[in-house]
């Protein structure tokens, strides 16, 4: 079914404007039959953040911003789905065009600006799937015109706690002016303090929902030191490394499109994001797990990210070029690697190459 979907959809979607193609893909997923996914090999199971993931391959935030198709994505083989980013109030985001393919680089530049339907509508959709099972995280962000961004995050934690498998506090999008300033130590300390207090207030009715922090790949190592220190001292449950980058690697071939303002994702982000996973892993010292995201487009790339320090991984931009069949391909490659090396689980290789990667020259 997935192969047929890719064969029919990929050629058509590539002819469309990138954002129109995304909208059509969402509508197409709504039409897929509700078929149970093939069970995952037990070797792929991951225990992280107090949750049991059937496999380590997740759909990153940004694809299903409004919780329209989380169950369709789970049926296609994802081990978990992250919806959002969601803001308290609906917002339209930045003017179009705001999403650009860099075809020859297998990359994407976006400046979407947290366009979403708002907390009320997204909550209604998630509440409607409450009995479906599966891990569905909620990525939360602040409204662009908010007078108190910390209060926005607190409100979203309180709102979505009954329906979220986990939360991702997104302070690393480059497309909301000033948002990345929340990664600075003093501001981050205040934010996490209030977010975790909010989580604890609703614990009795919603359980102990894990809270993860998503960071930018453009942090300096000194800034990363501060972020990890605050995250550990405040007791977050994990981190996602990383969001899109404002940098433009020297290797880019689509130079004209690369000049578009916004965050770069896809294959050119792989080396930088993987380096940041490794740098974060050595600083975390096992205090909590990491989710690695950025440029994963094959089983080999997924394995590299895991060996850099990621317990779980997420995809998005690579699906634009490889199709949804990439999910099963990555899982098959990871299973084959475990069988070939005589290992029982991926946890045995998480961070195996972190020290080596952090000793390499910085990616440019």
UniProtKB/Swiss-Prot annotation:
<feature type="binding site">
    <location>
        <begin position="316"/>
        <end position="317"/>
    </location>
    <ligand>
        <name>FMN</name>
    </ligand>
</feature>
<protein>
    <recommendedName>
        <fullName>Dihydroorotate dehydrogenase (quinone)</fullName>
        <ecNumber>1.3.5.2</ecNumber>
    </recommendedName>
</protein>
<feature type="binding site">
    <location>
        <position position="65"/>
    </location>
    <ligand>
        <name>substrate</name>
    </ligand>
</feature>
<keyword id="KW-0288">FMN</keyword>
<feature type="binding site">
    <location>
        <begin position="61"/>
        <end position="65"/>
    </location>
    <ligand>
        <name>FMN</name>
    </ligand>
</feature>
<dbReference type="GO" id="GO:0044205">
    <property type="term" value="P:'de novo' UMP biosynthetic process"/>
</dbReference>
<dbReference type="GO" id="GO:0005886">
    <property type="term" value="C:plasma membrane"/>
</dbReference>
<feature type="binding site">
    <location>
        <position position="266"/>
    </location>
    <ligand>
        <name>FMN</name>
    </ligand>
</feature>
<feature type="binding site">
    <location>
        <position position="170"/>
    </location>
    <ligand>
        <name>substrate</name>
    </ligand>
</feature>
<keyword id="KW-0472">Membrane</keyword>
<feature type="binding site">
    <location>
        <position position="175"/>
    </location>
    <ligand>
        <name>substrate</name>
    </ligand>
</feature>
<feature type="binding site">
    <location>
        <position position="242"/>
    </location>
    <ligand>
        <name>FMN</name>
    </ligand>
</feature>
<keyword id="KW-0285">Flavoprotein</keyword>
<feature type="binding site">
    <location>
        <position position="170"/>
    </location>
    <ligand>
        <name>FMN</name>
    </ligand>
</feature>
<dbReference type="GO" id="GO:0006207">
    <property type="term" value="P:'de novo' pyrimidine nucleobase biosynthetic process"/>
</dbReference>
<dbReference type="InterPro" id="IPR001295">
    <property type="entry name" value="Dihydroorotate_DH_CS"/>
</dbReference>
<comment type="similarity">
    <text>Belongs to the dihydroorotate dehydrogenase family. Type 2 subfamily.</text>
</comment>
<feature type="binding site">
    <location>
        <begin position="243"/>
        <end position="244"/>
    </location>
    <ligand>
        <name>substrate</name>
    </ligand>
</feature>
<feature type="binding site">
    <location>
        <position position="85"/>
    </location>
    <ligand>
        <name>FMN</name>
    </ligand>
</feature>
<dbReference type="GO" id="GO:0106430">
    <property type="term" value="F:dihydroorotate dehydrogenase (quinone) activity"/>
</dbReference>
<dbReference type="InterPro" id="IPR005720">
    <property type="entry name" value="Dihydroorotate_DH_cat"/>
</dbReference>
<dbReference type="GO" id="GO:0005737">
    <property type="term" value="C:cytoplasm"/>
</dbReference>
<feature type="binding site">
    <location>
        <begin position="110"/>
        <end position="114"/>
    </location>
    <ligand>
        <name>substrate</name>
    </ligand>
</feature>
<comment type="pathway">
    <text>Pyrimidine metabolism; UMP biosynthesis via de novo pathway; orotate from (S)-dihydroorotate (quinone route): step 1/1.</text>
</comment>
<dbReference type="Pfam" id="PF01180">
    <property type="entry name" value="DHO_dh"/>
</dbReference>
<keyword id="KW-0665">Pyrimidine biosynthesis</keyword>
<comment type="function">
    <text>Catalyzes the conversion of dihydroorotate to orotate with quinone as electron acceptor.</text>
</comment>
<dbReference type="InterPro" id="IPR013785">
    <property type="entry name" value="Aldolase_TIM"/>
</dbReference>
<comment type="subunit">
    <text>Monomer.</text>
</comment>
<keyword id="KW-0560">Oxidoreductase</keyword>
<feature type="binding site">
    <location>
        <position position="214"/>
    </location>
    <ligand>
        <name>FMN</name>
    </ligand>
</feature>
<dbReference type="InterPro" id="IPR050074">
    <property type="entry name" value="DHO_dehydrogenase"/>
</dbReference>
<dbReference type="InterPro" id="IPR005719">
    <property type="entry name" value="Dihydroorotate_DH_2"/>
</dbReference>
<feature type="binding site">
    <location>
        <position position="139"/>
    </location>
    <ligand>
        <name>FMN</name>
    </ligand>
</feature>
<feature type="active site" description="Nucleophile">
    <location>
        <position position="173"/>
    </location>
</feature>
<feature type="binding site">
    <location>
        <position position="295"/>
    </location>
    <ligand>
        <name>FMN</name>
    </ligand>
</feature>
<keyword id="KW-1003">Cell membrane</keyword>
